[in-house]
Regions:
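Surface-exposed, charge/polar-rich loops and edge strands
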Residues: 1-159
Length: 159
């Protein structure tokens, strides 16, 4: 991720930090989230030769995701608790279809542009995850486990 960090720093973003190898970036900027996402997508495509969907949340938005934590009463393993960050609100019928694929022990809560999903038996065994990871959401999405979500918020507090 040093190359990504350097690319974004050279493009004028400040306080650029990366976390693990899955494209998590925390940075400071004075421009809107939409402009940040579009600029990052363009820079990555030009530099690395592939297209990625960049989903952006401000520090305050990420703090709200953590504060809401609608599955805190059941999600006791942060690696099996995921938040899907969407670029728009999913249609209610899409959320219903995803929830219908859930095992009895799984949970799904949609709040705005986030889907909170609890997979107590692991993501690899989840039919609900197959639906969440597919293209059927009708919006662009990226998912992170709870450990990553809270770590990114901690990092954002430092920038």
């Amino acid at each position: 991720m040093p190359e990504l960090r350097a690319l974004l720093t050279d493009a004028g973003f400040a306080d650029v930090q990366t976390y693990v190898q899955s494209g998590n970036v925390v940075l400071s900027t004075g421009v809107s989230a939409n402009r940040v996402g579009g600029k990052c997508e363009k820079l990555i495509a030009e530099r690395f030769g592939f297209e990625v969907d960049v989903i952006v949340r401000s520090r305050d938005e990420l703090a709200e995701v953590v504060r809401l934590n609608p599955l805190a009463d059941v999600a006791d393993n942060p690696k099996r608790y995921q938040v899907s960050f969407l670029d728009g609100e999913p249609a209610p019928e899409v959320v219903e279809q995803i929830a219908a694929a859930a095992a009895p022990s799984e949970r799904l809560v949609a709040i705005g542009r986030e889907l909170y999903a609890w997979h107590p038996d692991g993501v690899g065994r989840s039919k609900m995850w197959t639906k969440l990871a597919g293209k059927g959401l009708g919006v662009r999405a990226t998912a992170r486990n709870w450990t990553t979500v809270t770590t990114l918020l901690e990092m954002a507090g430092e920038s």
